[in-house]
Amino acid sequence: ETVSSLRFTGPETYEAVRIEDSGASYSSEDVYFKKDEENLLPLDPVQVDEYIRTLQNLDLSDYASYYVSEEEWSTYGLDAPELSLEADYTFENEDKENVSGTLTVSVSRDPKEKEKAEKKENSEENSGEEEEITAYARVNNSQIAYKLTAEDYKGLMAMKYDDLRHKEVFWGDTEEITGIDISLEGADYSLTSKGKKDDRTWTYQEEEIETDELFSALKGLKADCFTEEESGQKEEIRLTLHLDNEVSPQVTIVLYRYDGSSCLAEADGKTVSLIPRSQAVDLIEAVNTIVLGNTED
């Protein structure tokens, strides 16, 4: 079974589509995208596949009511759902024919419980106790109200763009990187390579180098939270990655100082996230190991 589209109406309203060979991402693994007017914004395929599995494996064994009249849906908050989603899917039947369909699911938390939780949130009261969640769902135009598990409710509500997008600052294949230009503390360095993919040899100042720690630190740059805030502080490190990639021949990543615990990450001139400062330190140390190591030799 293949899900070709997810349309969300709720905390955020948007459509996620499945497109292979889209030309909209430097990663060939990216097949899911958020439609943003004329643009396609890459989504993390692992996160989207997990969301689809949650949808496919919903526990609908607990009936809150076998029959709900139109006037009674408000009892379950499903007269105005917190979230409505439509999933377009295709599967192959027993006759090897492709069959298409659309699944519609409406989700809401118990209205009284939701109101109580919102008041508690607004008052900033936090007892530290695990919150009890009672939630309901309606599937297609059924008159049945299903009681959802707390896990399924949380899984379905984790549908925002920030829930499903890539957490990594760079999520491409490091084997496609052919060269790296680095600016650090006012000095510029260039790492070059020869060969293809996993048979690539890296050099700095004509000396062969190991890049495992550098690439591990690069892939380790992951968002604590997403932001569009612009930095007015010091640039910590800048890397321009040259890629063997027709979609994006190069990607520029800049990390800026933010505070004692975080750095602001920018990709191709656009702020994307706040990352732990420790991750920036790991990257800087990996670069210094290469460039200072060669200088000492």
Language-model region placement:
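Secondary-structure "cap/kink" motif recognition
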Residues: 1-297
